[in-house]
């Protein structure tokens, strides 16, 4: 294997491994308490997101996929 090919291969593997880590571990951010509410209906389309992660939501709200959109919602305390 050529040195340039080996470098490309190694870089690709390292990039894949770093992306496979959970976000909370990578960025040192812990998710807010609670669980996202279940949304079991099929979405014919997905709306533009209002949030991308929990820290973008005020108070105790979590960023969850709900009603065909990523939005800030009150979390469930238990899974039902």
From Swiss-Prot:
<dbReference type="GO" id="GO:0005576">
    <property type="term" value="C:extracellular region"/>
</dbReference>
<keyword id="KW-0044">Antibiotic</keyword>
<dbReference type="Pfam" id="PF00095">
    <property type="entry name" value="WAP"/>
</dbReference>
<dbReference type="GO" id="GO:0042742">
    <property type="term" value="P:defense response to bacterium"/>
</dbReference>
<keyword id="KW-1015">Disulfide bond</keyword>
<feature type="signal peptide">
    <location>
        <begin position="1"/>
        <end position="20"/>
    </location>
</feature>
<comment type="function">
    <text>Antibacterial protein.</text>
</comment>
<feature type="domain" description="WAP">
    <location>
        <begin position="29"/>
        <end position="76"/>
    </location>
</feature>
<protein>
    <recommendedName>
        <fullName>WAP four-disulfide core domain protein 15A</fullName>
    </recommendedName>
</protein>
<dbReference type="GO" id="GO:0030414">
    <property type="term" value="F:peptidase inhibitor activity"/>
</dbReference>
<feature type="disulfide bond">
    <location>
        <begin position="57"/>
        <end position="72"/>
    </location>
</feature>
<keyword id="KW-0929">Antimicrobial</keyword>
<keyword id="KW-0732">Signal</keyword>
<feature type="disulfide bond">
    <location>
        <begin position="36"/>
        <end position="64"/>
    </location>
</feature>
<keyword id="KW-0964">Secreted</keyword>
<feature type="disulfide bond">
    <location>
        <begin position="51"/>
        <end position="63"/>
    </location>
</feature>
<feature type="disulfide bond">
    <location>
        <begin position="43"/>
        <end position="68"/>
    </location>
</feature>
<dbReference type="InterPro" id="IPR008197">
    <property type="entry name" value="WAP_dom"/>
</dbReference>
<dbReference type="InterPro" id="IPR036645">
    <property type="entry name" value="Elafin-like_sf"/>
</dbReference>
């Amino acid at each position: 294997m050529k040195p340039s090919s080996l470098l490309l291969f190694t870089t690709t593997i390292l990039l894949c491994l770093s992306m496979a880590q959970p976000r909370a571990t990578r960025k040192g951010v812990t998710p807010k308490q609670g669980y996202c509410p279940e949304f079991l209906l099929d979405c014919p389309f997905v709306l533009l997101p209002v949030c991308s992660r929990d820290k973008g939501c005020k108070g105790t709200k979590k960023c969850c996929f709900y009603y065909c959109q990523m939005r800030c919602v009150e979390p469930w305390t238990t899974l039902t």
